[in-house]
Amino acid sequence: MGVTRIGLLGGSFDPVHVAHIALADTARQFLGLDQVQLIPAANPWQRQPLKASAPHRLRMLELAIAGHPALAINPVEIERGGATYTADTVRALPGGPQYFWLLGTDQLQNFCTWRDWQDIAARIELAVATRPGASIAPPAELATWLAAHRRQLHELPFAPMAVSASDIRQRLAADAATDGLLPEPVAAYIATHHLYR
């Protein structure tokens, strides 16, 4: 029996949308992951304040991953509370599995601004979602660190989807259609609880 391989997808999930689930499923298949854990932020330090409460965001995640047995929710950041730093989350991971932090090319370009980014890169693998056929271009500081430590970035071919949580929130606030942007149970939950209005 080999080492368990776990993908980690952090985010505000405010709200969780179809691209989040598609990325998690693609990563699981392409990287041969046993599980992908979605980690909702308590208070992301680089973002605007969250619109939906932690209980609402957790419930929407539960609804979104129903029917996806290899996806799970890891509430560590919400349970810890306060400012959310990836380094703290990574340090709290139990030993044993091989972990892959899933990030987009925009996050990759900002990675060296993350608190204790070298510690993150030393502890877990970094998997970057890229357009199919595109190559990864890490910032120079990260590229130098990776070469010095004989580490590499894992490419995750993922066709970009024209969906963002901020756009969805704007649409919901304007009572505009969000068809195809949200998992259906999440859309129903948002409507029932009058979120993002």
Curated annotation (Swiss-Prot):
Pfam families: CTP_transf_like
Reaction catalysed by this enzyme: nicotinate beta-D-ribonucleotide + ATP + H(+) = deamido-NAD(+) + diphosphate
UniProt xrefs under Gene3D superfamilies: HUPs
Protein's pathway: Cofactor biosynthesis; NAD(+) biosynthesis; deamido-NAD(+) from nicotinate D-ribonucleotide: step 1/1
Name of the protein: Probable nicotinate-nucleotide adenylyltransferase
Function: Catalyzes the reversible adenylation of nicotinate mononucleotide (NaMN) to nicotinic acid adenine dinucleotide (NaAD).
Organism: Bordetella parapertussis (strain 12822 / ATCC BAA-587 / NCTC 13253)
EC number(s) on file: 2.7.7.18
Entry-linked NCBIfam families: cyt_tran_rel (TIGR00125), nicotinate (nicotinamide) nucleotide adenylyltransferase (TIGR00482)
Keywords: ATP-binding, NAD, Nucleotide-binding, Nucleotidyltransferase, Pyridine nucleotide biosynthesis, Transferase
Family statement drawn from the similarity comment of this UniProt entry: Belongs to the NadD family.
An example molecular function term from Gene Ontology annotations: nicotinate-nucleotide adenylyltransferase activity
Enzyme class, first EC level, given as a word: transferase
